[in-house]
Each structure stands twice: as structure tokens, then as C-alpha cells.
Amino acid sequence: MTDKNVNPDDDQADENRDDNVDERFADIVGDVDIDADQSATDSPAPEELSRESQLEALLAERTEDLQRLQAEYVNYKRRVDRDRALSRQSGVDKVITDLMPVLDSIAMARQHGEVEGGFKLVVDELEKVANNHGLTSFGEVGDVFDPNLHEALMQMPMEGVSVTSVSQVMQPGYKLGDRVLRPARVAVSDPDPNATSADESSQADGESAQADEDDETPRNE
């Protein structure tokens, strides 16, 4: 039996080849582990999905609460602004109502020519302040009677009047903006029904006389 000669270099090559195989195997296994870890990371766990759904539901609920709170605030601010305006208007109404008797006295004094000198300056300033708050007076002789604006204290027929009109102003009326605070107290004149009848009678007499003249006119035969 003959012994084969063993080459040391061949043994070393085999060892190197085995080491390379081991390294390649380790690399492949490592890549597989990394891919598995990456897949596990990319696919959320059921617990994470449940947590995300809870957060989304909570966010939607808080958003709805915020929108509701914002709407309530807008309504509250609108109500406060309205109440503030009403309160201010109520204060103006009270002051103007208290001033009306003074303004009546001033109007009467002006009719008698008693608003002169320094007193006139005070009167003009007072009326200016009242006008700045929207107060206006109304009621003049010759105005067509309006029951929404005038209170008739006296009423009498008058010739030459075609519609019921103001013939005398006892007390002026006042408006605050478009709202009537007090109607004007007036005497009114109505069309005279007797005068109308007399006019109609005169017209009828005239037509009758004209007809008689036509009857008496000779006719050419």
C-alpha cells in the first residue's frame, strides 16, 4: 500500500475556501434577519393601529368641541353687542324724553320772539345736541293730516280746503330716528261739505240756465 503525499498548500486552500463559505452564509443570514426586521417595522402591530385610531377619534372630538365653542362665542358676542346697543339707546331715549318739555318751552318762547341774545346761544346748542342724537321735531301748519304723526285736538270744516290739513300746531311732535316719540298735537281743517254742495248746486244751476238758453234760441227752418 502506497501513501499519498499530502500538499500543505492544498490544505490551506481548503481552509480558506471553508472560511469564505462561512462568511457568505453569515452574510446571507444577516441579510435575511435585516429584511425580517424591516418588514416587522413597516407593518404596524395591531396595538399600534388601535392606538392610532384612538388618537384620530380623539382629534375629531376635540375639533368638534372647538368648533362648537367658537360658535357659542360668536353668538355670545353678538348678543352682548345687541344688549349694549339696546342699553345705550334706552339711555338716549330717557334723556331725550326728559328734554322734551324743555324743548316745548323753547318752541313756545320762539313763537313769541323771546329767544334772543345769550339765551339763543344756549337754545341753539341744546337743540344741536338733541339733533346729534337723532331727535327731530315735526308738525307744521298746512301739513296733510296723518294719524300716525298727528293727534287732532280740534277739528273744524273750512272753505277752500280739499284735504284734511293741519291748521294750528299746539305742540310739536318728536321723532328719534324713524321712531315717533310723541305725535304732534294739532287742530285740523276738513273740507267744508256745505261749500261742496253749494258748488255743485251752482254748477247745476249754470248747466240748467245754459239749457234754457239753448231752448230759447230760434231755430232756422
Swiss-Prot record:
Classification via PROSITE patterns: GRPE
A GO term for molecular function: unfolded protein binding
GO BP term, example: protein folding
InterPro entries assigned to the protein according to its UniProt record, in alphabetical order: GrpE, GrpE_coiled_coil, GrpE_head
UniProt biased composition (Acidic residues): 210-221
Major place of residence: cytoplasm
Compositionally biased region (Basic and acidic residues): 14-26
Any one GO cellular component localisation term in the record: cytoplasm
Keywords: Chaperone, Cytoplasm, Stress response
Main function: Participates actively in the response to hyperosmotic and heat shock by preventing the aggregation of stress-denatured proteins, in association with DnaK and GrpE. It is the nucleotide exchange factor for DnaK and may function as a thermosensor. Unfolded proteins bind initially to DnaJ; upon interaction with the DnaJ-bound protein, DnaK hydrolyzes its bound ATP, resulting in the formation of a stable complex. GrpE releases ADP from DnaK; ATP binding to DnaK triggers the release of the substrate protein, thus completing the reaction cycle.
Quaternary structure note: Homodimer.
Name recorded for this polypeptide: Protein GrpE
Source species of the chain: Cutibacterium acnes (strain DSM 16379 / KPA171202) (Propionibacterium acnes)
Species lineage: Bacteria, Bacillati, Actinomycetota, Actinomycetes, Propionibacteriales
Gene: grpE
